[in-house]
Design a protein with these regions (language model features):
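ASCE RecA-like P-loop NTPase motor cores
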Residues: 1-228
C-alpha cells in the first residue's frame, strides 16, 4: 500500500517550495536537510507531504514523549490507512539500584511498565517486520536502545492462512515457542485459549484477537474478534 494523505488542506504559501526542495535533496543523496519554520507554520503537514511524495518508510524522532505523542496523533490523522506507529519508553517509573555508603543502605531496582505503551511498541516492531513499506514510526530517543535481533523476531513468527495443513497440536507448540501462554480464564495480550476445534490468540501488539478454526488438520477459517 502507498502513502496517501487524508486531508482537506493543500500545501500553500512556502510549503510547496519546501516540499519540492526537501524531496529533491533526498533524491540526490543529501545526508541532512533542515526545514525551518515558526510554530504553527505547518511543518508537520509539510513533512507528511514529503513522505507521500517519496513513498519511503519514515522514522520521526522527538526529544520527549509529550511531543512524540502529539506528532503520532497528527501523522495518524494524515495517514489513517497506513501504518503509523508509536515507539517510546514503556516505563512509567524507573528506580535504578543504588548504594548509599554513609548509611550502608542498598536500594533495589524498582520499575513500573505501562501496558498500553508496551502494546504500541510491539505493534511498531510488528509493522517493521511485516515487510510493508508504508510505515511511519514516531519515537523518542528510546529507539536508540535495541529490542533484540530481527532474526529472533522472524524465528518466533507464527504464520497461518486458510487452507493451511497443520494440526491443532502443532500450532499450539508453535505458539508456546513464540512465548504465548495458554489460559482458559485470563485471556489477555500474549495468551491463547482452546475451545474444541477453535484456537483464540490474543495478539501482543493489538486490541484484537485472532480466531483460528480447524477442520481436522486444516485451518478452515480465520477471523478477528474482540478479546472481551
Amino acid at each position: 500500500m502507498q502513502f496517501k494523505i487524508s486531508s482537506e488542506y493543500k500545501p500553500s504559501g512556502d510549503q510547496p517550495e519546501a516540499i519540492e526542495g526537501i524531496c529533491s535533496a533526498i533524491r540526490q543523496g543529501s545526508d541532512a536537510v533542515t526545514l525551518l519554520g515558526v510554530t504553527g507554520s505547518g511543518k508537520t503537514f509539510t513533512m507528511a507531504n514529503v513522505i507521500e511524495k517519496l513513498q519511503r518508510p519514515a522514522l520521526i524522532l522527538s526529544h520527549n514523549k509529550t511531543l512524540a505523542s502529539q506528532l503520532y496523533v497528527e501523522f495518524k490523522s494524515f495517514f489513517p490507512n497506513n501504518a503509523v506507529e508509536y515507539y517510546v519508553s514503556y516505563y512509567d517509573y524507573y528506580q535504578p539500584e543504588a548504594y548509599i555508603p554513609t548509611t550502608d543502605t542498598y536500594i533495589e531496582k524498582d520499575l513500573s511498565i505501562n501496558e498500553q505503551i508496551d502494546k504500541l511498541r510491539l505493534s511498531a516492531a510488528s509493522a517493521l517486520m511485516s515487510g510493508r513499506r508504508d510505515v511511519i514510526v514516531v519515537s523518542s530517543v528510546s529507539c536508540l536502545y535495541g529490542i533484540g535481533n530481527p532474526q529472533d523476531f522472524h524465528s518466533q513468527t507464527v504464520q497461518v492462512h486458510v487452507g493451511q495443513q497443520i494440526s491443532e497440536t502443532r500450532l499450539l507448540y508453535h505458539l508456546v515457542d513464540a512465548l504465548f501462554s495458554r489460559t482458559e480464564t485470563d485471556f489477555k495480550r500474549g495468551t491463547f485459549r482452546v475451545r474444541g476445534d477453535t484456537v483464540d490468540v490474543s495478539l501482543g501488539g493489538s486490541d484484537e484477537a485472532v480466531r483460528i478454526e480447524f477442520f481436522g488438520d486444516e485451518i478452515d477459517a480465520l477471523s478477528l474478534i474482540d478479546p472481551v
